[in-house]
Amino acid sequence: MRRAKLDKNATSNAVAYCSATGRHNLSATHASRLAFSVFSHPNVKAFLKSMEKETIDDMIMGRDELLSELTDIASTTIDDIVQIVHSSDNMMNVKRGRFIQDLSRSLLTT
């Protein structure tokens, strides 16, 4: 059986099917049939309808939103990421259910 080159002889659905599955050794006709069976499934139709252009446009970050995100990242300090504990702070040993009196000694023994 002669294999067709999908990028020239097949429909875009067949090319999409072969690209998604990695099965490039299919004939153009067989790939088109498989793609048709996938794309005609009600769940697939519903998903494709939900992913129309308007939905995709909403997913793209605008220039102002990008600038806002980058500003937040640039203004982040170490205190926003790490909580620094001092030896005078009250801490609780969760396993034992007791407050730690001497933090330096407790860290060495647990």
UniProtKB/Swiss-Prot annotation:
Keywords: DNA-binding, Hydrolase, Nuclease, Viral genome packaging, Viral release from host cell. The keyword Glycoprotein does not apply. GO terms for molecular function: DNA binding; nuclease activity. Residues 12-31, 27-46 bind DNA. This protein may possess the specific endonuclease activity required for cleavage at the pac site. This is Putative packaging signal terminase.
